[in-house]
Amino acid sequence: MRITKGKMKHNFKKWILGAAVIAGCAGMMGCSFTKDNTKSGDLNTDAGKRHDNLEYNGSVVDEDTLEKLASLETIIDQSYYFDTSDENMQNGLYAGLIEALDDPYAKYYTPEEFAKLQEDSSGEYAGIGVVVRQDEDTGYAIAVSITEDSPASEADIKPDDLICKIDDYEIQESDDLDYLVTKIRGEEGTDVTLEIYRPSERKYHTVTLTRRKLENSTVSYHMADTDKKIGYVRVTQFVANTGDLFRKAVEDLKSQGMTALMIDLRSNPGGMLSTVVDMCDYLLPAGKIVYQEDKNGNVLSTYESTNEEQLDLPMVVLVNGESASASEIMTAALKEYGVATIVGENTYGKGIVQSVIPLSDGSAIKLTTAKYFTPNGNDIHKKGVAPDIEVELPEDYVSDDFQGEKDTQYQKGLEVLRGNVK
């Protein structure tokens, strides 16, 4: 894989996380992003680049602003009924500056939050084992996928379940997904009680789970058709170890005689850019995978495949309206190179880049810094990637139908690959 970089300005300039893994479960994080503020995703992490000593030439923090802040602090000290702390007030100032951008993907991380964000991207956590996104209307955390043999799976939490309450805290529409993930995660061996609404039953459930250390297994696989030797690999998000897990899965299927491959990216909110680029390098011929441009149209980075080990098999990629960000990068590249047939629904349409910029006190900010473009130069932001074969799930589909007869997208993928295998 080759990466070429254009000229970049050193200014305050990603997961999907987009999805969040609460497996520790951390978040669709590194970060990736889904439509509903899901964490996890397309993070460009400018780790090691410190921006604290930049010469200030702005106009926001002027003398009048400082004087007004001092007046506000004095009024709060004298008149506010409840207790607060200097640290809370200061963090509120920093967060408020970022929130004023009115960008759902921009965020200020306290040192504690940033440390958890970095942990979330590593692939091992202490938590309950569920990947979540956030509903933009209610603020509720929606289960996207459940880790096998985890507290969440043992408690029978299912995809599409809505987490409405965490211990005694009722989730608000204004809550940030990072904040919710922090409340669900905790020390190994401690309990968390969740109130869950299951749409398929129209019922609320209350479950208590004990957090434990879990490896965030973002990849699962099996031989979907043992006669035709059609392999199936599901990728729920892109964290640091996903690329290695994906290669191992494919190599294992190849050792079993695999003749065609179905990659399931449905409801994958995204994740780390470096991970999806590495996976595309394994699947594509030599050439461009994705490139980024800043707001002035300058090319910041171009990511290319070296074609050192292209997987030469018929492929299908399954996607839906919750496939976002890094998932769309992979989908678009495989489609435009003609190496895979895309089956399902139009993807979400998140084609912007967030960068996480660490500060010297251990805190960090996440800002939208660029836009992605596909190998053919297409802008997918707010448009998504259209499938080659559009297939919707039936109205009576529920999560228990996954990979079954009612999973019409999965069945169509098998049909396409069976037609390509002799």
Model-identified regions with their sequence ranges:
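Cleft-lining beta-strand/loop regions that shape enzyme active-site pockets
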Residues: 2, 144, 153-155, 159, ...
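Intrinsically disordered, Ser/Thr/Pro/Gly-rich linkers and terminal tails that flank
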Residues: 2-134, 165-166, 171-225, 237, ...
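Short, histidine-centered active-site or binding-site loop motifs used for metal coordination
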Residues: 76, 147, 395
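Glycine-rich active-site/cofactor-binding loop and its immediate structural neighborhood
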Residues: 123-169
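A generic secondary-structure signal marking the coil-to-beta-strand transition
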Residues: 126-128, 139, 205, 229-231, ...
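Flexible glycine/proline-enriched surface loops and loop-helix/loop-strand junctions
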Residues: 229, 313, 392-399
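Conserved P-loop NTPase
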Residues: 354-358, 365-397
